[in-house]
Amino acid sequence: MVESASTMAGELGVSDATVVRTAQALGYGGLPELRRALAGQVEDVTLDERLHHSLARTGNDLLVDAADSLVASLDVLVRHMSGSRFDHAVEILGGADRLLWSGIGPSAPLADYASVLGGRLGRPSLALTRSGPAAADDLLALTPGSAVVVLSYGRLHRHVDALLRHADDLAVPVVLVTDVLEGQLGDRVAETLVCWRGPPGLFASHAPTMVLVEALMMGLARADPGRAESSLAQLEDLRALTGTG
């Protein structure tokens, strides 16, 4: 489901237009709409079914199987990630006074991790990980001059919609990291980075997202190495001061 029309066309030996027309013949407006529909079907798979299907695909060496699955997911990430989009995302984040990382559920620890990395590299950062009514408190953190990275997979959650509305009101740029929401949200964000979490219907792997987050952080460090190195040197001094070096 991650392939673009051009990639799918190349693999099938047909034109891009043929792929789009086929999706339309099935009753969809185009490939993005078909992708969202398929994702919706996958969302209906229960967690226990995901585990069952995942275990059914494993052999005797679970570690090797897990590593092979991760390598395959990272290969998809690298092959389908546009270099210009990645560079644009780094440019957006690099121009912000503060970075906000939004993620709930399993994505919340990734948002926390990204926030820690950002702070260490001299980029003031904050993780927005609350949901429900408490998500409104997180939205208060959005201020002009900041930039938001939204980690959102599968269906569109209400708090993400609210965040995008508030960010638009404040002219705060948003970088969306997602699997299938580009077609639905692409025109509401400054940039979209497609990051797949493994085969649909199986247990999701968040390792590709972590790799992407770390790559974004390295991109920021490369954009301003003096700032990153100065912050890390200060961190070393503070560790010595607190006895944690």
Which positions does each model-derived feature cover?
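Short, charged beta->alpha transition segments
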Residues: 84-89, 134-138
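Glycine-rich phosphate-binding loops that contact phosphosugars or nucleotide phosphates
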Residues: 94-222
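HTH-adjacent hinge/linker in prokaryotic transcriptional regulators
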Residues: 1-2, 6-85
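Alpha-helical scaffold segments in soluble metabolic enzymes
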Residues: 21, 33, 37, 73-76, ...
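Short amphipathic alpha-helical surface patches that mediate protein-protein
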Residues: 6, 39, 94, 233-237
